[in-house]
Each structure stands twice: as C-alpha cells, then as structure tokens.
C-alpha cells in the first residue's frame, strides 16, 4: 500500500488506507508499518494507528473518478473510488446506453477500483458505464466516453494536451485555466484530445492522497477526467516536495495512476512505472521521471529496439 511523506501543516492530517477483506486471512493477521524521519537530525516523530472495520452495508457512491488510464488502440483501464467497498464492473459500447462489451468483474470488494477492457477497435469512440456487480449503476452518461488510440497509419490530426503544475491548490487559478481549455474544445468542436499528458506536480503541496482528492480530482473529476485518456509523470510535489524521498516508489502517486509500462500501448516494455512509453497514431511518447533517483537509470530506459515512428 502506498505510503506518504508529509511535513509542516500536513502532519496533522491523518493518512488513511482502505484494505479489502481479501487482504486478510482467517485467524491472526499482522499489519506492518515502517516510518522514517526525513533526515538524521529530525526529532519530532510520532505515530498512532487506528483500525476500523466495516461489516458491509450502504449503497456505493463514487468518491473519485472515474478516470481513464493506459489507453491503447485496443484496450483501456478505468479506475474509480467508492465510499464503501463493492465489486466493480465496467461495460462499454459504441452507442450511449447500449453496452455490448464488459470487462472482468472485480473478484474482491474494494473501494479502489480498476477494470481493464480489451478487444476494442482502434480509433473508435466508446461510451462506458461504471457499476457495482449487484446492478447498482454508479455512473454512465453522455460525458462518460473515450476514443481508442488511432493506428500508426492514420492520416488524421493527432491532438495532445499537456498540463503542468495542474494541482497547485489554487482553485481560482485552476478553474480559470480549465474554463479556457474547455471553451477551446467547445469552440473548435473537439470532444477530447487523443492524449492528456501530466508533466508533474499534480497535487500540491506534498502529493498526499488528500491533496490529490482536493487539488486534482476535485478540480477535474466532474469534467475532463471522465473522457480524457491520461498519461501522467511525477514532479517534486508528487514526491512530498522533499529531496529525501527521491528514491521512494511508494508515494500516493504510484498507487493512484496506472501506466502502460508493459508495452501494451506500443513501444518497448519498461516494467517500471516512472519510465514508460506509448504510441498515439504515428507518434511515440516517452514519459520520464526527472525528479526521482534510480540506482541504474539505463535499465529503466527503452533498449532502442522499438519501431521508429514519424514523430
């Protein structure tokens, strides 16, 4: 489970994790927690742990997302969070309300949902519906759609939007930029770009889960997150805004996002979340982590055997 690095005023905010019942075994269970100071001279470490059980009940409601991950020509991963644990289901179709393709139902009740749909047609617009497996529809309307990536031989224009420092925690600034961007889409008759790239610093100030909720999902969750295929990269704020965390790979960023690190969207598999590549039409993208440190950076980068693209 992803951990977090916090400092200053963030230290007074509890960090919560949801554990599915499938994480437990019958009998005794051990929960291990490891804590570190940011440096050898820091002396104000304290720790409290509270374990709460939810025996079930309650109607699930989406509290984060849905958002689109690891988009390729023939597949996509849809993620979301619910207020109570349930088994998730995703259905898609080329006509709104007529969902003819379904991903695998989640086998374990959870609040952190992720379903991958495969077998899709390239460069095709699909509508999707997110539900619980008991039939409770959580979301599925005209704004819940995506377009699969076009093939390499496409001749149409490829549209890409890049957001940097988009989770800065200034709602007035973010709302204004978002309004201008959405106005551009509407004025030019564009549903959504083919890729939405995050350049880092996605949740100020320390990249905590609460800050992601407020400063990223709270801003974009009710609009473009539903229909923009997202390809993220981390920045210093996603590492807790601390150089002491440069080697950490257990920040909330790493559990929030799913990236095509296994070559499922084109390119050479990196098998590593912080460095990955993907194709959108005849364009090949590389996503690089410029803040974190690696013991062996060369092993994280593609070996050069990928087919060359026009761009």
Question: Residue spans of the language-model regions?
Answer:
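Short low-complexity, flexible loop/linker segments enriched in glycine and/or proline
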Residues: 1-4, 302
């Amino acid at each position: 489970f992803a951990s977090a690095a916090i400092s200053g005023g963030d230290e007074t905010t509890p960090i919560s994790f949801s554990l599915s019942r499938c994480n437990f075994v019958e009998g005794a269970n051990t929960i291990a927690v490891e804590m570190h100071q940011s440096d050898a001279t820091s002396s104000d470490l304290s720790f409290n742990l509270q374990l709460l059980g939810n025996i079930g009940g309650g109607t699930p409601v989406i509290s984060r997302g849905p958002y689109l991950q690891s988009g390729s020509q023939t597949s996509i991963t849809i993620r979301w969070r619910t207020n109570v644990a349930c088994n998730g289901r995703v259905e898609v179709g080329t006509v709104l309300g007529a969902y003819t393709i379904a991903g695998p139902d989640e086998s374990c009740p959870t609040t952190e949902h992720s379903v991958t749909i495969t077998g899709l047609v390239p460069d095709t617009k699909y509508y999707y519906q997110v539900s619980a497996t008991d039939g409770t529809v959580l979301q599925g309307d005209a704004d819940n759609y995506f377009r699969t990536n076009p093939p390499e031989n496409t001749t149409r224009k490829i549209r890409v939007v890049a957001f940097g420092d988009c989770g800065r925690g200034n709602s007035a600034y973010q709302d204004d930029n978002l309004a201008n961007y959405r106005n551009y889409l509407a004025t030019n008759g564009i549903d959504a770009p083919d890729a939405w790239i995050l350049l880092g610093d996605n949740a100020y100030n320390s990249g905590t889960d609460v800050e992601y909720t407020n400063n990223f999902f709270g801003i974009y969750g009710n609009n473009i997150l539903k229909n923009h295929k997202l390809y993220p990269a981390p920045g210093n704020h996603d590492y807790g805004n601390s150089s002491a965390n440069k080697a950490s790979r257990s920040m909330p960023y790493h559990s929030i996002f799913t990236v095509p690190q296994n070559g499922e969207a084109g390119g050479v598999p990196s098998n590593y979340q912080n460095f990955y590549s993907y194709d959108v039409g005849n364009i090949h993208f590389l996503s690089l982590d410029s803040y974190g440190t690696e013991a062996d950076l060369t092993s994280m980068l593609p070996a050069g055997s990928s087919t060359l693209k026009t761009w």
